């Protein structure tokens, strides 16, 4: 409880929600709660409860400071093993930029040795003064480790809340949109004409980021808003600690302007850039909970997403999986559209065994996203619908026959509509860089496009 009729929990606790109910300890009444905002990257959700009875006698929690190592911590929740409240105690083991499993992102996290189990998610963690130092959210499980739990610190929680208050919605944590390499090797620094033991090398710039206008591959970032960046990709943190460079970025908000000190060709210069959330070509979560889909003569098209990959991992080809892992969006709104399955009918004879194949073009026009595909189908006046797939496979349907068969196919398979509700409206092409859509290749990256990259390489 944080006051003003609002509650906090983990985003994964209310994922795909249709109705959320909450109740207080010692109360036998459940109250309906409304999800106001859901932060996938930070795994936080903001809820509101309108009933005055729920808030009677309730006191909001006080947010405490970021703890120190070995500070005592108490975790409260309702984990597996019983129905009543559970309290476990431990100490703070580590504070660093941590991988958030739910959003595949990296933000500041607190590692503790107090027991955290399924059901603890969304519960508060307290210090000895009774102040809330964060929200329990995940645990590390391994045969070689035990008692490694994680808490979202109040600094991340406060950023989420301020983002919501500023914009009336949650916009997300921003990024620079670059792939960086550490500069710990002296020969590498000398080759790049970096005079001191500092800086990180720009290896890739995301086409959708604002810094694509000011940074180039081969630039070396040596400062961020005046803070020096070390050659191992860290910056000063508190009095005598260092932390990953991306921590500074996570303290900013979408739309904030920053000053970068860079070395280019041996010369130092300063550039300005605007931060904004990362554009994911393949989203980790489906916004709204329901996937977009379009059915054309039994051919079911949908955007590629991580949930789809997890569901169909055995049937998704290596080429498509590689593209999902290593490609970057070249413009906002870009999607990888796949034919997920075929609802067998005489109109699509010969295509029944197709599944999880990427569709590239319709009647010669490259497909930008699922809504664009729906628009191309609707606006087609020719005799045929010609779909071009990856690996040069061709699917041709007679347009009139396809339209005539649609209603019977939907009826046979018990499907209420040929497309999802988000595709019902008119298509608006808002893509600014139209030349990017004509290119055949996506922005391939030398490393996985997951936030945490690989050893020596990091996304920021």
Q: What function would you assign to each model-found segment?
A:
Residues 13-15, 212, 223-261, 361-391:
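PDZ domains, with a preference for the canonical peptide-binding region formed by the helix
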Residues 2-85, 118, 268-270:
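Conserved active-site neighborhood of the chymotrypsin/trypsin-like protease fold
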Residues 55-62, 69, 232, 246-247, ...:
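C-terminal, low-ordered peptide segments at domain boundaries
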Residues 50-60, 86-146, 195-198, 203, ...:
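Active-site region of chymotrypsin-like
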Residues 166-227, 302-352:
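PDZ/PDZ-like groove recognition
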Residues 6-11, 66-79, 91, 112-116, ...:
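Active-site-proximal beta-strands of protease catalytic cores
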Residues 1-4, 29-32, 87, 121-122, ...:
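A conserved glycine-rich beta-strand in the N-terminal activation segment of trypsin-fold
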Residues 1, 115-135, 211-217, 351, ...:
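Catalytic nucleophile loop of clan PA
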């Amino acid at each position: 409880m944080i006051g003003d009729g609002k509650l906090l929990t983990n985003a994964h606790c209310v994922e795909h929600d249709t109705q959320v109910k909450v109740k207080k300890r010692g109360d036998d009444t459940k109250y309906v709660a409304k999800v106001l905002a859901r932060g996938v990257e930070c795994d936080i959700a903001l809820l509101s409860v309108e009933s005055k009875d729920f808030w009677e006698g309730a006191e909001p929690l006080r947010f405490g400071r970021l703890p120190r190592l070995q500070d005592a911590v108490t975790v409260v929740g309702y984990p597996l093993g019983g129905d009543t409240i559970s309290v476990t105690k431990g100490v703070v083991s580590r504070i660093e930029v941590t991988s958030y499993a739910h959003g595949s992102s990296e933000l500041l996290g607190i590692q503790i040795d107090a027991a955290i189990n399924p059901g603890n998610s969304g519960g508060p963690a307290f210090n000895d003064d009774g102040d809330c130092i964060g929200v329990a959210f995940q645990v590390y499980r391994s045969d070689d480790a035990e008692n490694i739990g994680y808490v979202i610190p109040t600094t991340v929680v406060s950023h989420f809340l301020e983002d919501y208050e500023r914009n009336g919605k949650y916009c997300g944590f921003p990024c620079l949109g670059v792939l960086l390499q550490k500069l710990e090797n002296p020969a590498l620094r000398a080759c790049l004409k970096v005079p001191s033991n500092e800086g990180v090398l720009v290896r890739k710039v995301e086409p959708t980021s604002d810094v694509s206008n000011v940074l180039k591959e081969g630039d070396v970032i040596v400062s961020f808003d005046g803070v020096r960046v070390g050659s191992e990709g860290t910056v000063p943190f508190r009095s005598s600690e260092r932390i990953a460079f991306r921590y500074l970025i996570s303290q900013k908000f979408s739309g904030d302007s920053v000053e970068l000190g860079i070395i280019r060709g041996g010369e130092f210069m300063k550039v300005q850039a605007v931060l904004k959330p990362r554009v994911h070509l393949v989203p980790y979560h489906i916004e709204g909970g329901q996937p977009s889909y379009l059915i054309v003569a039994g051919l079911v098209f949908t955007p590629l997403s991580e949930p789809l990959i997890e569901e169909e991992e055995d049937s998704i080809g290596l080429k498509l999986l590689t593209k999902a892992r290593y490609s970057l969006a070249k413009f906002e709104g870009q999607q990888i559209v796949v034919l997920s399955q075929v609802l067998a009918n005489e109109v699509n004879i010969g295509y029944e065994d197709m599944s999880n194949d990427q569709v590239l073009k319709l009647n010669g026009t490259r497909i930008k996203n699922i809504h664009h595909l729906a628009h191309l189908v609707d606006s087609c006046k020719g005799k045929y619908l010609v779909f071009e797939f990856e690996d040069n496979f061709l699917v041709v349907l007679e347009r009139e026959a396809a339209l005539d068969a649609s209603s019977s196919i939907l009826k046979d398979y018990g499907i209420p509509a040929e497309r999802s509700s988000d595709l019902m409206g008119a298509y608006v092409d808002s893509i600014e860089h139209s030349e990017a859509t004509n290119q055949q290749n996506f922005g391939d990256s030398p490393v996985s496009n997951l936030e945490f990259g690989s050893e020596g390489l990091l996304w920021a």
